[in-house]
């Protein structure tokens, strides 16, 4: 679903990774040194972006529930998703987490350093922000994601 959404927004083809990002994460990080750029992109994160989006790294999470009150203290779940995202990241990647929770809504977590423009957000620990899907998707952020992912304005 998120790959189709990104395909519509950016008018470029995105596809869901058929296997887990763990193929290149954690202790498997060094595998990327013997792989082509295209091979790395096929196993990094949960979405395979267009070929020229070499700095795009995202995770997609779909869960029944999320305990929002933990965002004000410490969310082991969100911390785990951040760790998972960063485990497959290369230097200068645009790291982003798309989340959907049953009967609650869709949300986006992103690194604060990216300076996306959103109306409302929660400043989470470890340099990440948490916002709603509706607040996140605007023309400025769409252009910024496209440019950053292609290496423009790094």
Annotate the PLM regions.
Residues 1-154:
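Catalytic phosphate/metal-binding cores of nucleic-acid and nucleotide-processing enzymes, i.e., regions
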